[in-house]
Amino acid sequence: MVVIAVSGQPGSGKTTIAREIARVLGLPLVSSGLLFREMAARMGMDFIEFHKYAETNPDIDKKVDSLAIERAKAGDVVLEGHLTAWIVRPYADVCIYLKASLETRARRVALRDGKSLQDALREVAEREELNRRRYLSIYGIDINDLSIFDLVLDTSHLSVNDAVRISLDYTCTSLSFKYSRKIC
């Protein structure tokens, strides 16, 4: 019953790397970020508006997090999200944290979302601060404390393939050691 949690900064490559780990291991992917985006769309809000709304409505985060916990308890899943690893750590075999420079992350978000670099810089910085405040007030979690992670990877100067390879190498080695058999 393998459980892998991938967390990290906005634009660090969480979803891309989690998706690839899930594909290689043949496991389903549960993305808190995608659930959050879907909730925002259903409420007719853009992503930043919804983050601000969630800051005063903690039930939103708790709803997403309870789904992550439920899936982690069931096992055989890759979970992805900014806070996911902190939430599912008791059930996770491997927790990976991805980070990158603000400029790199903004460039990725601009490319992904079709925004100007200036807008993406502002949005990424704002999202990060909103997340930090929200998680501290709701859960008492300091997202700058990375001590719970098995692997912390700076993706600033890595290609997607290199970041995926490093993450998979670590994950496969760790799981094989834990389960005393080859996992991937």
UniProtKB/Swiss-Prot annotation:
Single GO BP term: pyrimidine nucleotide metabolic process
Main subcellular localisation: cytoplasm
GO cellular component: cytoplasm
Alphabetized GO MF terms: ATP binding; CMP kinase activity; dCMP kinase activity
Gene from which this protein is expressed: cmk
CDD domains (UniProt xref): CMPK
Lineage: Archaea, Thermoproteota, Thermoprotei, Thermoproteales, Thermoproteaceae
UniProt cross-references to HAMAP family, sorted A to Z: Cytidyl_kinase_type2
Enzyme class: transferase
Cell compartment(s), UniProt: Cytoplasm
E.C. code: 2.7.4.25
Protein's name according to its UniProt entry: Cytidylate kinase
Binding sites annotated in the UniProt record for ATP: 8-16
Family: Belongs to the cytidylate kinase family. Type 2 subfamily.
Organism this protein belongs to: Pyrobaculum aerophilum (strain ATCC 51768 / DSM 7523 / JCM 9630 / CIP 104966 / NBRC 100827 / IM2)
Catalyzed reactions per annotation: CMP + ATP = CDP + ADP; dCMP + ATP = dCDP + ADP
Domain of life: Archaea
Keywords: ATP-binding, Cytoplasm, Kinase, Nucleotide-binding, Transferase
